[in-house]
């Protein structure tokens, strides 16, 4: 074993104990590419394609494919796979009944993207129906079709296809390729940097001052920060990944020690499942090699569907079984009296001095053409966001 591999062993084990790798190369890839020409095809939407990628690259370890019915029922009802491994979100592949009837159990299905590129193969082991309202209630905590994750669920086909997958071609990530690392690569990077303890931070928003505060608070206790923004499918009113990625680069360059933070994309779709998605986010960062994970206010939430600290409360129940330490932070604010960031734990001043920050407020101000005040955002970040949105609005 090389010195780098030995260092990797000192870091956290993947979820389930083994880092899954279902991405084919060399002769096996060529064999499947040849075989795929005679297979029935299925076109994946962006959401399912990102799931395929994260199963294949190990981000969703220990999953090796789309979930069968036993795992599915166990996940939605008991927050674990059928073998007892903690898992909170069903990773499934839905089709309509007519499509499902065209596929025979035991056959392989060629998986194409909406761009007609062949990305993978599914070895079909199961087909099963499911109750959409039951899944919505148990996973999202609501059956309200106005919830973006529930809306997506209700629009899906009525049958789930299940079985192991192989990825033949990795999806392109356009301008973000230099920030793409799979879990094997992040683990190697952490080892080369000499990081033994790493905190992961999930975001779909630009980094505002509250984010910076909790990231740096966590950095006081660990060797490094993995800033791991989601660049997959999000709501239409979320700030685009292109603008956000530029803002992340700017803030890391100007306000973080170069040897203490790394920017890596998380190529997943956003489910907006709040507490249940917080658990999934922790599992994925564990697979990427993080020893710690930050859960702040209303993690992975949307609207008023979840309580401010509901995600923290739920993930605390599973922290020991998850095998990753959770940093839980209160709602941070800028205190105009302190002239600094703080929380109720560190600031003695009244609410009239507190400027509360959130991704929603940042988005609202930007869309209204308002300059972000220094209490909200670093000026370099504000400039990137204003220019980016202005450019988007004129296109």
From Swiss-Prot:
CDD domains: ATPS. One of its GO terms (molecular function) is ATP binding. Its EC number is 2.7.7.4. Gene3D superfamilies: HUPs (3.40.50.620), Sulfate adenylyltransferase (3.10.400.10). Pathway: Sulfur metabolism; hydrogen sulfide biosynthesis; sulfite from sulfate: step 1/3. InterPro entries: ATP-Sase_PUA-like_dom (IPR025980), PUA-like_sf (IPR015947), Rossmann-like_a/b/a_fold (IPR014729), SO4_adenylyltransferase_pro (IPR020792), Sulfurylase_cat_dom (IPR024951), Sulphate_adenylyltransferase (IPR002650). GO terms for biological process: hydrogen sulfide biosynthetic process; sulfate assimilation. It catalyses: sulfate + ATP + H(+) = adenosine 5'-phosphosulfate + diphosphate. Keywords: ATP-binding, Nucleotide-binding, Nucleotidyltransferase, Transferase. SUPFAM superfamilies: Nucleotidylyl transferase, PUA domain-like. Belongs to the sulfate adenylyltransferase family. This is Sulfate adenylyltransferase. The gene is sat.
């Amino acid at each position: 074993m090389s010195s780098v591999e030995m260092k990797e062993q000192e870091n956290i084990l993947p979820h389930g104990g083994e880092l899954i790798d279902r991405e084919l190369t060399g002769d096996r890839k060529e064999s499947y590419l040849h075989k795929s020409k005679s297979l029935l095809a299925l076109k994946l939407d962006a959401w399912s394609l990102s799931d395929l990628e994260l199963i294949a690259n190990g981000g969703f370890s220990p999953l090796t494919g789309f979930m069968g019915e036993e795992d599915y029922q166990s996940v939605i009802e008991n927050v674990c796979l059928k073998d007892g491994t903690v898992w909170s979100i069903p990773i499934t592949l839905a089709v309509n009944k007519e499509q499902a009837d065209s596929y025979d159990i035991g056959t392989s299905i060629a998986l194409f993207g909406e761009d007609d590129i062949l990305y993978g193969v599914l070895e079909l082991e199961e087909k099963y129906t499911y109750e959409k309202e039951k899944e919505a209630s148990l996973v999202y905590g609501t059956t309200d079709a106005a919830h973006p994750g529930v809306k997506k669920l209700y629009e899906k086909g009525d049958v789930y296809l299940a079985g192991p997958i192989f990825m033949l071609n990795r999806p392109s990530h356009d301008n973000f390729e230099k920030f793409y690392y799979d879990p094997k690569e992040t683990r190697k990077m952490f080892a080369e940097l000499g990081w033994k303890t790493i905190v992961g931070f999930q975001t779909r928003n630009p980094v505002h001052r509250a984010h910076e505060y909790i990231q740096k608070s966590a950095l006081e206790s660990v060797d490094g920060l993995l800033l791991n923004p989601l660049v997959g499918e999000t709501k239409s009113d979320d700030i685009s990944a292109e603008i956000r990625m530029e803002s992340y680069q700017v803030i890391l360059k100007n306000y973080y020690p170069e040897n203490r933070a790394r920017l890596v994309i998380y190529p997943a779709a956003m489910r907006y499942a709040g507490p249940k998605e917080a658990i999934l986010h922790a599992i994925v960062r564990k697979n990427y090699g993080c020893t710690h994970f930050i859960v702040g206010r209303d993690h992975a939430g949307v609207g008023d569907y979840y309580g401010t600290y509901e995600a923290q409360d739920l993930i605390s129940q599973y922290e020991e079984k998850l095998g990753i330490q959770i940093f839980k932070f209160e709602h941070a604010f800028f205190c105009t009296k302190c002239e600094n960031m703080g929380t109720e734990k560190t600031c003695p001043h009244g609410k009239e001095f507190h400027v509360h920050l959130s991704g929603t407020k940042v988005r609202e101000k930007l869309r209204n053409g308002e300059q972000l005040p220094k209490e909200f955002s670093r000026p370099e970040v504000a400039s990137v966001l204003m220019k980016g949105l202005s450019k988007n609005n004129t296109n």
